[in-house]
């Protein structure tokens, strides 16, 4: 048996930067769903899942752009789109044009893990990743020698953990918003470590009442009802009223 060094802590002995507990606000209704203090908390991780075509990328870019417009340093890491694809988004949502974006397709001949490490080391308040599966595949494909998907995911989660703890140049506790795929049955697809590292899990789906956004898990509290939304308005997602979870078909 290998002897493992076990460490226990007492919370009264730990000290954190007060800024860690100040929410990042978009100034819109969705803030109340991310935390009981109305906003996205620093140093957290959120998985985003939902029906195909429901608007996961659009909604999360809208949230990211609103954070950016209120002074947060944000980054979009896209493993799904290229700059031509993104141009179409910007025509409909001009505020997306101001977002710093790392297109992983521009670095397909380089080591993707090192590329992500190099950009994250700057220090960011909030990073949106679309999608975890594509980033994992990119890391696997560009690593010298063989790397399993489990190992690739683990390396990415290690990065999340380091930057959650502000291990970057600006010592910022980074929040990660991670768009994640589900199985054909609609179940969450991911390792136990991924699930445990997620502060919360947000869902978007089509219902007879319209598109909804809700959390099935959120360690930071927040509104438990589902928030209706639509993509009709120009340059912003339209957040509407709420539905109790027992009213959703």
Question: What residue ranges belong to the model's regions?
Answer:
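Phosphate-binding P-loop
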Residues: 35-43
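Phosphate-binding/switch loop-helix module in NTP-utilizing enzymes
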Residues: 105-173
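Conserved beta-strand segments of the P-loop GTPase G domain that flank and frequently precede/overlap
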Residues: 76-78, 102-104, 129-130, 177-181, ...
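Phosphate-binding/switch region of NTP-binding enzymes
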Residues: 158-249
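Conserved P-loop
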Residues: 42-114
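Short acidic, S/G/P-rich loop/turn micro-motifs used as interaction or catalytic elements
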Residues: 54, 82, 108-109, 133-139, ...
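Short, well-ordered alpha-helix to beta-strand connector turns
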Residues: 43, 71, 124, 198-199
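N-terminal pre-Walker A segment at the start of P-loop NTPase domains
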Residues: 4-34
């Amino acid at each position: 048996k290998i002897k493992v060094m076990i460490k226990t802590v007492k919370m009264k002995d730990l000290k954190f930067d007060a800024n860690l507990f100040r929410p990042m606000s978009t100034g819109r209704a969705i803030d109340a769903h991310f935390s009981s203090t109305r906003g996205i908390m620093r140093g957290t991780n959120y998985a985003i899942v939902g029906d195909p075509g429901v608007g996961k990328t659009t909604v999360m870019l809208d949230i990211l752009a609103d954070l950016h417009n209120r002074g947060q340093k944000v980054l979009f890491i896209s493993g799904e789109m290229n700059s031509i694809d993104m141009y179409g988004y910007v025509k409909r949502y001009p505020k997306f044009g101001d977002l710093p974006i790392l297109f992983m397709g521009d670095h397909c001949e380089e080591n993707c893990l090192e590329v992500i490490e190099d950009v994250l080391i700057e220090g960011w308040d909030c990073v949106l990743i679309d999608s975890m599966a594509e980033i994992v595949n990119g890391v696997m494909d560009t690593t010298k020698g063989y790397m399993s998907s489990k190992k690739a995911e683990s390396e990415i989660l290690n990065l999340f953990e380091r930057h959650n703890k502000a291990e970057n140049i600006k010592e910022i506790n980074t929040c990660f918003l991670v768009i994640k795929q589900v199985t054909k049955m609609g179940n969450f697809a991911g390792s136990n470590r991924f699930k445990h590292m997620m502060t919360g899990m947000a869902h978007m789906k089509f219902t007879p009442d319209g598109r909804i956004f809700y959390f099935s898990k959120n360690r930071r509290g927040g509104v438990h009802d589902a928030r209706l939304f639509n993509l009709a308005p120009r340059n912003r997602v339209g957040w509407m009223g709420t539905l109790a979870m027992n009213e959703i078909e």
